[in-house]
Amino acid sequence: MNFLDESFWLAVSFIIFVYLIYRPAKKAILNSLDAKILEVQEKVLKAEKLKEDAALLFEQTNAQIQKLETLRSQMIEESNEVTKKIIQEKTKEIEEFLEHKKSDAIQLIQNQKSTATKELQDEFCDEVIKLVSEYFQSAKFSESNIAKNLMDKSDSSHNNDKST
């Protein structure tokens, strides 16, 4: 290899040229890479923070869901109890109403029964009085007829005795 050869000096010049260009470019490249690294690190930190926030939000949401489930269960239980209580009250009211209606119906039946009994007794008494009155009138008539007949018979027999 000859040091005076053009190819050699061309190669050396090229290496020096590359070195001179690389040196300032190295700083720019390193600065650019450092900036990219910082940017990526910031994005990673933001992503981790978002992940933590999402996990916290998920936990809070789950806690709220649990509270709402508990509240829903309590509300359902309370509404069932209130419903049962209302049903019991209304059932009791209906039973009292029916009992009252039953006693009213029994009282009405007894009143109608006593009224009907009194009417029948009054009709019976009126009929008996009428029959007794008719009997007495017919008996008076009969008595007067009997007395007349007896008198007539006694007169006839008395007249027959006299004739004989």
Swiss-Prot record:
Assembly description: F-type ATPases have 2 components, F(1) - the catalytic core - and F(0) - the membrane proton channel. F(1) has five subunits: alpha(3), beta(3), gamma(1), delta(1), epsilon(1). F(0) has three main subunits: a(1), b(2) and c(10-14). The alpha and beta chains form an alternating ring which encloses part of the gamma chain. F(1) is attached to F(0) by a central stalk formed by the gamma and epsilon chains, while a peripheral stalk is formed by the delta and b chains.
Species of origin: Rickettsia felis (strain ATCC VR-1525 / URRWXCal2)
Keywords in alphabetical order: ATP synthesis, Cell inner membrane, Cell membrane, CF(0), Hydrogen ion transport, Ion transport, Membrane, Transmembrane, Transmembrane helix, Transport
Compartments, record wording: Cell inner membrane
Protein name: ATP synthase subunit b
Chief location bin: membrane
Highest classification ranks of the organism: Bacteria, Pseudomonadati, Pseudomonadota, Alphaproteobacteria, Rickettsiales
Record's signal peptide: none
Listed HAMAP family: ATP_synth_b_bprime
Transmembrane regions: 7-25
